[in-house]
Amino acid sequence: MNYFPWLTIIVVLPISAGSLIFFLPHRGNKVIRWYTICICVLELLLTTYAFCYHFQLDDPLVQLTEDYKWINFFDFYWRLGIDGLSIGPILLTGFITTLATLAAWPVTRDSRLFHFLMLAMYSGQIGSFSSRDLLLFFLMWELELIPVYLLLSMWGGKKRLYSATKFILYTAGGSIFLLIGVLGIGLYGSTEPTLNFETLTNQSYPIALEIIFYIGFLIAFAVKSPIIPLHTWLPDTHGEAHYSTCMLLAGILLKMGAYGLVRINMELLPHAHSLFSPWLVVVGTMQIIYAASTSSGQRNLKKRIAYSSVSHMGFIIIGIGSITDPGLNGAILQIVSHGFIGAALFFLAGTSYDRIRLVYLDEMGGMAISMPKIFTMFSILSMASLALPGMSGFVAELIVFFGIITSQKYFLMAKILITFVMAIGMILTPIYSLSMSRQMFYGYKLINAQNFSFFDSGPRELFVSISILLPVIGIGIYPDFLLSLSSDKVEAILSNYFNR
């Protein structure tokens, strides 16, 4: 038991300090921006300090645990703790949220509410990744939806209300299944409700009931991940949202679904997962091909990047379905890797829109001449997205490949077929990625326009882009830094499958 409540402070600080924004004196938006950035930086420093000095890498058990009785009436606890699975997403959340607040510098309308919602979302996300109680996980999952809905409906494009409504209908529908699953597991087989992850890991269920629970959780996480065919909210949402919100959606929100699949479906329901894993692999493979080929036909720049996100999430699903050490490690690495790359691409797409006020690729062209810095950063990150060796995406996708090839669960012909289809998906990725760069940056369309006067990236935008690029290259060159965090926990999860 840890005596200093590090995780409680990390979870509660953003939303509690964020609520003080409304009491700041009226001295323009600059005060609010700096205050929000300071909270995010302080939070990131606290998280890094707590993990560096209080987290043992060689211990697969839950660390920094906190366990407080919250509501006596139905045995509800405030249980927090981290292990090798949650440490990567928590650090990713802190990093991306800090850069997203910096990216939101141009937002001037209702600035207080905007920054408060970003901080409230931050608390919900950290809470989801660090909760060790099933009901607390559900509460944090829901807490995070409200700020996202408001951010989508109040700031963005002309169809933002439509996309926000679509988002909330999909996610609230998924949350119903999540709540049913949480209550079903908590109330099963005992007079006292049991919601503690540690207790539930050792709980066994009749196979039919376990399959029902599994399907309920799978639907909830499939909406968030997103897994086809529950992905249609994502392109609309990304197409209309402000780019700082897109950074949070692509960088963190999608990763919550993948995290939930590993944390609940894999860890708590191993029998059902071993039955469903072949279907997950098939759906993941279809998703890579479908999203990559659909992305090529998108005229809207942000929708094209959104479909590329759906395609990359396919690798995570295949890694989770492979039930192997490399497959699951690769999926966790891809969660962090795509969090950085997706956020960076949306940021650069948004800064480009701020300058040229165009969203359709066939209206762009010639940006490379007037904006060489944006061109350079976008080109490098496009290469990272298509898994160029030396970038984080390459390592993650390669390890997932090894995972599916070395899996004992599938026949040789099935593995060859899956690998072949995945390889086709990886060939389709450069097609939409490089054609996107060509349509945006090459040619003369914008130069021939009457009001041709565009300025390149300023110091703030360059700082955000480089800050995201450095971890992408760092993970690509030395992936062991992240893999060493998760490998012990992955072995502990997979021991449920091989000891039966």
Curated annotation (Swiss-Prot):
Disulphide-bridged cysteine pairs: none
Cellular component terms (Gene Ontology): chloroplast thylakoid membrane
Keywords attached to this entry: Chloroplast, Membrane, NAD, NADP, Plastid, Plastoquinone, Quinone, Thylakoid, Translocase, Transmembrane, Transmembrane helix
Transmembrane spans: 4-24, 37-57, 87-107, 113-130, 134-154, 167-187, 207-227, 242-262, 272-292, 305-325, 330-350, 386-406, 411-431, 462-482
Any one GO molecular-function label of the UniProt entry: ubiquinone binding
Catalytic reactions of this protein: a plastoquinone + NADH + (n+1) H(+)(in) = a plastoquinol + NAD(+) + n H(+)(out); a plastoquinone + NADPH + (n+1) H(+)(in) = a plastoquinol + NADP(+) + n H(+)(out)
First-listed, main subcellular location of the protein, grouped into a coarse class: plastid
Enzyme Commission numbers on file: 7.1.1.-
Pfam families the UniProt entry points to: Proton_antipo_M
Location(s), subcellular: Plastid, Chloroplast thylakoid membrane
Protein name: NAD(P)H-quinone oxidoreductase chain 4, chloroplastic
InterPro entries in the record: NADH_Q_OxRdtase_chain4 (IPR022997), NADH_Q_OxRdtase_chainM/4 (IPR010227), NADH_UbQ_OxRdtase (IPR003918), ND/Mrp_TM (IPR001750)
HAMAP family the UniProt entry points to: NDH1_NuoM
Membrane topology of the entry: Multi-pass membrane protein
Superkingdom of origin organism: Eukaryota
GO biological process, one term: electron transport coupled proton transport
